[in-house]
């Protein structure tokens, strides 16, 4: 899931106890910072950078899988991902392995109970949103599914797909190869016809998808979970345009819209992320999220899709929390992240 910021004020040091939660908020919320709108050159990434599940963007997939493992063990869990913990263990990042297994608690890395509980609930809500999206799509008769930037997503294995469903997973070659091998070692069997498509989404993935058997004449359910902030603005537009071009009428798309923060929120966020990075580094894990995400101004996702012929529905994190009867939290910063929008759309 840091750039020098000077000495942290006392209230931020106190909030730094939320290290793990803050980083997961950053990943799940896909933050765009108002101060950085219109700026470029802030990234250390390159146009053709690659990664595995223990480095760079790939490590964030392992972090989210860690959170799914924790959410699956929660009292009255909203989700059940039995593959999350063994996959995290297979990746081998010690910090995440110990957290996912329960050997290390969030509190052990300085995370107070409220932030930790919110983080677990947040990932559960996000996961359930996409689980329900696919359930609704298949209930409507869709039998072709595309999971973009699949990472350690195990929906092909854990969701009850109707007979005849075909699931295409797209991600970088090293990620696809690792997950496929790790799940085979667990003797896991997919519940649908699964096709792993090893291609970078910045390359010609539509051709690779069609070469794997994808039929653009059939309605499809696409997901782009926690993805858009890892693409430059033009890349986001190209991705959405490609999805539209591949979509037959009645196709569906689920994604998240990056959250725009004002200047004060931007400064506080950087301080919190600095605390998270320091806490991780003390545990032997070195990752600076500010080097992974593109901060440049981009088109509003909901508006862009609507302009391309999609019928768009949005829900905030707050609304999804309330729908599950989960309590709000007093921390204003955490509550702000619950304003992020979850988007589902149908092509008409």
Curated annotation (Swiss-Prot):
Its EC number(s): 2.1.1.-
Entry binding sites for S-adenosyl-L-methionine: 171, 200-201
A Pfam short name: LCM
UniProt name for this protein: Putative S-adenosyl-L-methionine-dependent methyltransferase MRA_3439
Keyword Methyltransferase in annotation: yes
Organism per entry: Mycobacterium tuberculosis (strain ATCC 25177 / H37Ra)
Residues forming coiled coils: none
GO biological process, one term: methylation
Domain of life: Bacteria
Cited InterPro entries: Ppm1/Ppm2/Tcmp, SAM-dependent_MTases_sf, SAM_mthyl_Trfase_ML2640-like
EC top class named in words: transferase
Function noted in UniProt: Exhibits S-adenosyl-L-methionine-dependent methyltransferase activity.
Family: Belongs to the UPF0677 family.
Keywords: Methyltransferase, S-adenosyl-L-methionine, Transferase
Any one GO MF annotation of this record: methyltransferase activity
Tagged with keyword Methyltransferase: yes
């Amino acid at each position: 899931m840091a750039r020098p910021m000077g000495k942290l004020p006392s209230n931020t040091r106190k909030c730094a106890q939320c290290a793990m939660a803050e980083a997961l908020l950053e990943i799940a919320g896909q933050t765009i910072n108002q101060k950085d709108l219109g700026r470029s050159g802030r990234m250390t990434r390159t146009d053709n950078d690659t990664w595995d599940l223990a480095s760079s963007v790939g490590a964030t997939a392992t972090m989210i899988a860690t959170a799914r493992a924790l959410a699956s063990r929660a009292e009255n869990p909203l989700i059940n991902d039995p593959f999350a913990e063994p996959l995290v263990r297979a990746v081998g990042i010690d910090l995440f392995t110990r957290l996912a297994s329960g050997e290390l608690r969030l509190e052990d890395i300085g995370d107070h109970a409220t932030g930790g509980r919110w983080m677990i609930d947040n990932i559960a809500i996000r996961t359930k949103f996409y689980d329900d999206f696919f359930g609704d799509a298949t209930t409507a008769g869709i039998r072709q599914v595309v999971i973009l930037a699949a990472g350690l997503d195990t929906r092909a294995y854990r969701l009850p797909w109707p007979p005849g469903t075909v699931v295409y997973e797209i991600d970088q070659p090293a990620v696809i190869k690792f997950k496929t091998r790790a799940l085979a070692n667990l003797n896991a069997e997919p519940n649908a016809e699964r096709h792993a498509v090893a291609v970078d989404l910045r390359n010609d993935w539509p051709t690779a998808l069609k070469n794997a058997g994808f039929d653009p004449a059939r309605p499809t359910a696409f997901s782009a979970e926690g993805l858009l902030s890892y693409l430059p603005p033009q890349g986001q537009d190209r991705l959405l345009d490609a999805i539209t071009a591949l979509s037959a009428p009645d196709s569906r798309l689920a994604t998240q819209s990056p959250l725009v923060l004002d200047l004060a929120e931007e400064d506080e966020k950087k301080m919190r992320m600095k605390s998270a990075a320091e806490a991780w580094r003390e545990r032997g894990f070195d990752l600076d999220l500010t080097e992974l995400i593109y901060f440049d101004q981009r088109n509003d996702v909901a508006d862009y899709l609507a302009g391309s012929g999609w019928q768009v529905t949005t829900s905030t994190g707050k609304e999804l929390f309330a729908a599950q009867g989960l309590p709000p939290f007093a921390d204003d910063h955490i509550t702000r992240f619950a304003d992020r929008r979850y988007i589902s759309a149908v092509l008409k």
